A protein has these predicted regions:
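A ubiquitous short alpha-helical element
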Residues: 1-7, 26, 78-84
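Charged/polar positions within long, soluble alpha-helices
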Residues: 19, 23, 43, 47-54, ...
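Hydrophobic/basic alpha-helical segments enriched in Actinobacteria
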Residues: 15, 32-39, 63, 69-75, ...
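Hydrophobic faces of stable alpha-helices that mediate helix-helix packing
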Residues: 8-15, 35, 87-95
């Protein structure tokens, strides 16, 4: 029993139940594949739940710095919707700055922007944990 469960813990416990209790009881191969896919979704959601807001706030600051903003706007709260909205605004600022750097031929800034994008893609790949529809 978890006395103070986080979303990550709840999802990981559901994943464990699927793989340790449900999956061994399933005989149909198609259903086994479905259970394995659900397990991947649960584990990915657990990882995202544990870190998503921190990852986005880190990227918000980095994108605004790249864009030359005076400073990232204060996110009104740590509720996911507010952080996602701030992340979207930071992404727009980053995109505009990257377009300007490309148009100006500023290779150093383009490289820095590419590094930021590589970091984002790397984090997304980590988050997806190699997600592909299993067996399909």
């Amino acid at each position: 029993m978890i006395s103070r469960p986080t979303t990550e813990q709840i999802l990981n416990n559901c994943s464990r139940e699927l793989t340790e209790v449900v999956l061994p009881a399933v005989e149909d191969e198609t259903v086994k594949v479905t259970v394995m896919m659900l397990d991947l979704v649960l584990r990915n959601a657990a990882l995202r739940a544990a870190h998503e807001i921190a990852w986005m706030t880190d990227e918000i600051a980095a994108m605004h710095e790249f864009a030359g903003s005076a400073g990232p706007p204060t996110v009104p709260s740590l509720h996911l919707d507010a952080v996602v909205e701030a992340y979207g605004a930071a992404s727009e600022a980053f995109s505009a700055a990257m377009e300007s750097a490309v148009a100006a031929g500023d290779d150093a800034k383009v490289r820095r922007g590419a590094e930021l994008m590589d970091r984002r893609v790397g984090r997304e790949e980590e988050l997806m944990a190699g997600w592909t529809p299993v067996g399909r």
